[in-house]
Swiss-Prot record:
Protein name: Cytochrome b
Misc. remarks from the entry: Heme 1 (or BL or b562) is low-potential and absorbs at about 562 nm, and heme 2 (or BH or b566) is high-potential and absorbs at about 566 nm.
Superkingdom of this protein's organism: Eukaryota
Keyword Transmembrane set for record: yes
Matches recorded under Pfam families: Cytochrom_B_C, Cytochrome_B
Length: 379
């Protein structure tokens, strides 16, 4: 008799995705982040659901309702901090996943990569609207500053901003709609993630060498289920350590002050995972130019497959490209640091240089280095 998991219409899908999936035998731990992102998404939806049961999206009660969750709801404090720090873990996994894709040439799977870029934008949008919900000072001013950037769009900018706000400033209407967006977007992310997987399973996984591995595949279960479980345990351990020992380490103290439209915080800045893009935005003195640079800093990922000039897919055997890749990582860390600093003399020039280097590395240096490496292969 045939096994039910191979015949049942629903179980067959699960079987082909998580059990009998042919997987390259040599994929490293950098391939763990896909499953970890799935785990993060599930955790965020579950903790978010329980938070939504007690939260009120109204300017007069939003801040109090978050305080109420932390003080009066059974284990509300841990649900709230798991959700807040879970977002940080989500972005750590996301950036590692993207870095893996860049290093090993996974972007050659065009459809999978493009859905991934759309997913990144969606996750960033979700995190942004979510940060507004506690209605602290940084929530309010972050929402004001970032939505105001749209006013740089010629002709329709001002109308567009007021349409998003639902009035002439960030107010009740804005908070209510942001809560609605924050609730619906994770389900859109889930749907996109499924499409991401469908496209990936059309081609099969890449591997560290970048060489086709069709002749050397192993079943996903038990080999990679056990490997993913180890990754999941490490992720949960890190999240719990962060949540239970330093819940506010990655947050902003200003967000413990209720939103006040009459008092601007000294330094308006987003959460750490957006600081690199914020630094690029601030490094251009022109408003529209800054907005375009901000958008392009993420959108540039969609052009990565077109900028691939190497005859090899992976960077595994390309030392010069490896050097530039780690230079890019260091540059992004520098931008992240700059984004959290005030707009003053030493930081401004460092931010501008780091921003120039970011675009220069991706658009010029990496493609040119790949061409040089192609020549060197003939020696």
């Amino acid at each position: 008799m045939t096994n039910i998991r191979k015949t049942h219409p629903l179980m067959k899908i699960i079987n082909d995705t998580f059990i009998d999936l042919p997987t390259p035998s040599n994929i490293s731990s950098w391939w763990n982040f896909g499953s970890l992102l799935g785990l993060c998404l599930i955790m965020q939806i579950l903790t978010g659901l329980f938070l939504a049961m007690h939260y009120t999206p109204d300017t007069t009660t939003a801040f109090s309702s978050v305080t109420h969750i932390c003080r009066d709801v059974n284990y509300g404090w841990i649900i709230r901090y798991l959700h807040a720090n879970g977002a940080s873990m989500f972005f750590i996994c996301l950036y590692a996943h993207m870095g893996r894709g860049l290093y090993y040439g996974s972007y050659a799977f065009r459809e999978t990569w493009n859905i991934g870029v759309i997913l990144l934008f969606t996750v960033m949008a979700t995190a942004f609207v979510g940060y507004v919900l506690p209605w602290g000072q940084m929530s309010f001013w972050g929402a004001t500053v970032i939505t105001n950037l749209l006013s740089a769009i010629p002709y329709i900018g001002t109308t567009l901003v007021e349409w998003i706000w639902g009035g002439f400033s960030v107010d009740k209407a804005t908070l209510t709609r942001f809560f609605a967006f924050h609730f619906i977007l994770p389900f859109i992310i889930t749907a996109l993630a499924i499409v991401h997987l469908i496209f990936l399973h059309e081609t099969g996984s890449n591997n560290p060498t970048g060489i086709p591995s069709n002749m050397d595949k192993i079943p996903f279960h038990p080999y990679y289920t056990i490997k993913d479980t180890l990754g999941a345990l490490l992720l949960i351990l890190t999240l719990l350590m962060l949540t239970l020992f330093a819940p506010d380490l990655l947050g902003d103290p200003d967000n413990y002050t209720p939103a006040n439209p009459l008092s601007t915080p000294a330094h308006i800045k987003p959460e750490w995972y957006f600081l690199f893009a914020y630094a690029i935005l601030r490094s251009i003195p022109n408003k529209l130019g800054g907005v375009l640079a901000l958008l392009l800093s993420i959108l540039i990922l969609a052009f990565i497959p077109m900028l691939h000039t190497s005859k090899q897919r992976s960077m595994m055997f390309r030392p010069f490209s490896q050097f530039l890749f780690w230079m890019l990582v260091a540059d992004l860390l520098a931008l992240t640091w700059i984004g959290g600093q005030p707009v003053e003399h030493p930081y401004m020039i460092v931010g501008q240089l780091a921003s120039i280097l970011y675009f220069l590395l991706i658009l010029v240096l990496m493609p040119m280095t790949s061409l040089i490496e192609n020549k060197l292969m003939k020696w």
